[in-house]
Amino acid sequence: MGDDGIEWELEDLDGGVLYDVFYESTTMLAGRMLAQRRLAAARGDRDGERRAEADRHGLLAARDKVGPTDRRTLIAAKRSNDAARGARAEAVAPWHAVGGSLKVDVEGIWRDDIRPVVDAAERSDKPCTVFVGGQPGAGKTRATHLVRVSGLHDGPLLPVNGDDLRQYHPDYDRLCDEEPLAMPERTAKASAAWIRMTMEYADENGIPAIVEGTWRNAATVLDEAANAKHAGRSTHAVVLAVPPVLSRLAMLERYY
């Protein structure tokens, strides 16, 4: 491990874990930009609000262009994301005192922040839903990217990822800094609701989608597949068969 720890570790990560680490760092930076936008809105700073949203939009657009096998770019982008997030820490600090005290307006956040993103996705006369399943550390995010560019569906697939949706929780950015181990549990209820709303909207509006999850609750996945079928969509399942010991090592590599 190098003097700074993280950089040396990045060089050693395998492909699937490296892509997931890069992707997570992008989500965390996007969450900070979202917190900055909300802080600017609360202050009536329209210019600051627009700047934060433009930065966030550019970040997420750039993320989708990075290939999962481009190690050089993945490592550089991960480091850049971490540096950019750190540089915004002081500016976003006032939001941390606000976000933790707010009641989570699940419907309002869906309406104002998430639905516009979903609504911008491309429609299809023959929509499909792809379900990607595997345990934590299996490389689901990398697999999702590979499926999206594989040609399985003739057109774009809207990615639906519970970890991505956590960033919309008003306390997400503070939790990532101060209580990272508690963050998944604290944001789980809202994230699950937003997944459900996103899938319902995709089904109703003919938006092809790819859904990533652990499939911990088989009934939930089967219900979503049945809903998709009832909506006239084709369905596909992508299952990652990864030995438990490898996924455990992947989680250790990712967080330590």
Give the positions of each predicted feature.
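Amphipathic alpha-helical coiled-coil segments
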Residues: 57-77
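N-terminal pre-Walker A segment at the start of P-loop NTPase domains
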Residues: 92-121
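The conserved Walker
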Residues: 135-136
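Conserved nucleotide-sensing/catalytic segment adjacent to the nucleotide-binding pocket
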Residues: 154-159, 164-225
